[in-house]
Design a protein with these regions (language model features):
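Contiguous mid-protein beta-loop-alpha structural module that forms a pocket-lining wall or clamp
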Residues: 172, 187-189
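A glycine- and small/hydrophobic-rich beta-loop-beta segment
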Residues: 165, 177-186
Length: 270
């Protein structure tokens, strides 16, 4: 069930897991993609070596619920990344979309001391309001999320943390959104990936009576995007003057080349 796609000449996405058993109230993925399943570690290693032979230097590990890797085989996500860290053929790995309740302290500590896993996390929050998280049927409360961010920043101060957030979920009252906004604004994260809530037939969210008007949903998206822009600016500014390793990926017509630092700062060199 492995698949990979090339994002750039030096980087590719490797899908190590598919499907989901979580049944969040707004989401149809468990119905569309089936139950959670993943490849064996030995097959992931083989796929990584295969893409390395094509000149790929960086792999982003992806999945619907990446941290759920191996649950049906007895292997674990931590087992996987420990094994991949020994793979000489690939310079860099990144972890994409790992649920906060599956982002263990052991995983964070491993990345902090890893040779090949970059100081870069992508963790879905979805809402900064516990009331809305309950309506979403998420498996954590915001306090757990804040603890994970704090753990990352304590062990890896320069880590880039990207966060998924949904705006305008059914049941997200003005008070709940303001509560979420304040919580998110106070998080020491680097960027928000903001999505407007959209209705999905067959989901439990449709049973929630309070509907956010479309114009208000749009306003909330923009409010969160403004927070994201400020956070990304602050993260970049904090690193001005530093020297960090860069994997260059492309060149433009003018001859400049671009790439990303280990902690996911975009740079261009003339």
């Amino acid at each position: 069930d492995l698949a990979y796609s090339y994002g750039d000449r030096t980087r590719c996405f490797l899908k190590i897991q598919d499907g989901c058993d979580y049944f969040c109230s707004y989401c149809t993925i468990p119905f569309a993609r089936g139950r959670s399943r993943s490849a064996a570690i030995q097959d992931v290693i083989k796929a990584a070596r295969d893409v390395a032979s094509k000149g790929i230097k960086e792999i982003i590990l992806t999945g619907v619920n990446t941290g759920d890797f191996g649950r049906e085989t007895g292997e674990t996500f931590l087992d996987l990344i420990r094994t991949l860290d020994e793979l000489e053929e690939i310079q860099r790995f990144r972890i994409s979309s790992i649920e906060p309740n599956l982002l263990t302290d052991d995983i964070i500590r491993f990345v902090a001391s890893s040779r090949r896993f970059m100081p870069h996390f992508h963790v879905p929050l979805q809402s900064g309001s516990n009331e809305v998280l309950h309506l979403m049927r998420r498996r954590y409360e915001r306090e757990l999320f804040a603890e994970k961010v704090q753990e990352i920043k304590t062990l890896i101060p320069d880590a880039f943390i990207g966060v998924d957030v949904i705006a305008g979920m059914r049941g997200e009252t003005p008070e709940a959104f303001e509560d979420a906004r304040q919580f998110i604004a106070g998080l020491d994260v680097s960027q928000l990936h903001v999505f407007p809530y959209s209705e999905r037939s067959g989901t439990k969210a449709l049973d929630i009576p309070y509907i956010v008007p479309q114009a208000e949903k749009h306003r909330r998206v923009n409010t969160l995007l403004d927070i994201s822009e400020q956070k990304l600016h602050d993260f970049y500014t904090a690193h001005v003057g530093q020297t960090r390793p860069v994997l260059f990926e492309e060149s433009d017509i003018a001859g400049s080349i671009g790439g990303f630092t280990d902690n996911y700062i975009r740079v261009e060199v003339p």
